Amino acid sequence: MEKIPCAIIGSGNIGTDLMIKIMRMSKHLEMGAMVGIDPKSDGLARAARLGVPVTHEGIDGLRKLPNYGDIQIVFDATSAGAHVHNNAILQKDGKKVIDLTPAAIGPFTIPAINGDANIDEPNINMVTCGGQATIPMVRAVRRATDRVIWGEIVASISSKSAGPGTRANIDEFTETTSKAIEILGGAEHGKAIIILNPAEPPLIMRDTVFTLSQGGSRESIEQSILDMVAAVQKYVPGYRLKQKVQFENIGDNAPVRIPGVGLCSGLKTTIMLEVEGAAHYLPAYAGNLDIMTSAALVSADHWAAKQLQKEAA
């Protein structure tokens, strides 16, 4: 079956995990290039061993590769700052861009929430690993209630799974995730916190989601959450609730003070998640890699399927 060649810029943890997923699991994509800036990186060495064209000269090196003209889709797994530069060049060259950094130049995309709604945009943004894991839960509460006043997420990932790109983007992570909690999650106000856990042996990715909502019943909220978990599990099998959803009534007689909002009452929902990785590159504790790369692959595969249909027509 014909496949569309793609390139990955960024040979770190996320880029390498994505490469392995494409080679093992993609229905409509094939690796055309792996791009890095460190000639000694494990990702480039692994790509070369697997027969993938490689360059350690960044995007300039990618453009020099003889098969660059055949590459239709480029995944950027570098950093928010680098993506701005890379995207400008790739758009001029007519490439479809999947952004795995928190740069958020293109529209936010979380497959379980907005599916293929942005599939034809020249650049789509995959939010962040914490956003991919938690924002579906905020959305699940929102669709079962009249309003979600506050959505707050805490993403705890193993320090070992966070490469230099992730560490350089902590501020962008919190800003982009907070914004996406509001835009995709439907919360009126969003807040995001990331924790790099240095524990040894490394701990699996854990996420906690807090919402304060009005309207809707506990039963309808819980069912909506379970349905959303099932939707995410279709492309991330290791995604699951860590324990039963917790509820707490915040009455008018004892309201909570929300920053920038004031005193509020409603139903507080606490959702605890665990994301186990598929261990394609790093071990299973790195669920943060898995949920990000799986979401990007699903979106790209759907786009590639559409392109192949157009070419066949």
UniProtKB/Swiss-Prot annotation:
It catalyses: acetaldehyde + NAD(+) + CoA = acetyl-CoA + NADH + H(+). The active site is at 129 (acyl-thioester intermediate). The keyword NAD applies. GO terms for molecular function: acetaldehyde dehydrogenase (acetylating) activity; NAD binding. Its EC number is 1.2.1.10. NAD(+) binds at residues 11-14, 161-169, 288. The keyword Ribosomal protein does not apply. It is an enzyme of class 1 (oxidoreductase). InterPro entries: Acetaldehyde_dehydrogenase (IPR003361), Acetylaldehyde_DH_C (IPR015426), NAD(P)-bd_dom_sf (IPR036291), Semialdehyde_DH_NAD-bd (IPR000534). It comes from the Bacteria. GO terms for biological process: catabolic process. This is Acetaldehyde dehydrogenase.
